[in-house]
UniProtKB/Swiss-Prot annotation:
Keywords: Cell cycle, Cell division, Cytoplasm, DNA-binding. One of its GO terms (molecular function) is sequence-specific DNA binding. It comes from Klebsiella pneumoniae subsp. pneumoniae (strain ATCC 700721 / MGH 78578). Pfam families: MatP, MatP_C. Required for spatial organization of the terminus region of the chromosome (Ter macrodomain) during the cell cycle. Prevents early segregation of duplicated Ter macrodomains during cell division. Binds specifically to matS, which is a 13 bp signature motif repeated within the Ter macrodomain. Homodimer. This is Macrodomain Ter protein. It is found in: Cytoplasm. The gene is matP. One of its GO terms (biological process) is regulation of DNA-templated transcription. GO terms for cellular component: cytoplasm. Belongs to the MatP family. Disulfide bonds: none annotated. InterPro entries: Arc_rbn_hlx_hlx (IPR013321), MatP (IPR009390), MatP_C (IPR035375), MatP_N (IPR035087), MatP_N_sf (IPR038339). HAMAP family: MatP.
């Protein structure tokens, strides 16, 4: 496992995930009967700051179909949490117009690289081009000086 699991922190994430799914109208409990489901949800809503009880609630009441999705969400959240600790792993976002994103995605796909790798490669190409142009300009100037054509 690459990232350490922090039970109390992740329990809070799980609680927030379940409450969000409930508010979005998803069935978060294993119960078909509405009153039993509502009683379980009401119980969950009181457990916000009780990590051990949230875990017990999940074991006892949660809809099994939701388990895999919740695990994936928590795994992604854990990764973002630990990556945010270091500048070099912290993710940033940029807004692109759809047409720009489409062209960039197409280029990345043709090159077999990620969007980030493609952007870095384009920046490096532009830097090399600038360096080459500067070097050529300098050589041209030096050649003109040698030939006495200032």
């Amino acid at each position: 496992m690459k990232y350490q699991q922090l039970e109390n922190l992740e329990s809070g994430w799980k609680w927030k995930y379940l409450v969000k799914k409930h508010r979005e109208g998803e069935l978060i409990t294993r119960y078909i009967e509405a009153s039993a489901a509502q009683a379980a949800v009401d119980d969950l809503l009181t457990l916000e700051n009780e990590p051990v009880l949230v875990h017990a609630w999940i074991e006892q009441h949660m809809n099994p179909a939701l388990m895999n999705r919740m695990k994936q969400t928590i795994r992604a959240r854990r990764k973002r949490h630990f990556n945010a600790e270091h500048q070099h792993t912290r993710k940033k976002s940029i807004d692109l117009e759809f047409v720009v994103w489409q062209r960039l995605a197409g280029l990345a796909q043709r090159r077999g690289k990620t969007l980030s790798e493609t952007i870095v490669q384009l920046i490096e190409d532009a830097e090399h081009k600038e360096k080459y142009a500067s070097k050529m300009s300098s050589l041209k100037h030096d050649l003109q000086v040698l030939l006495g054509k200032e």
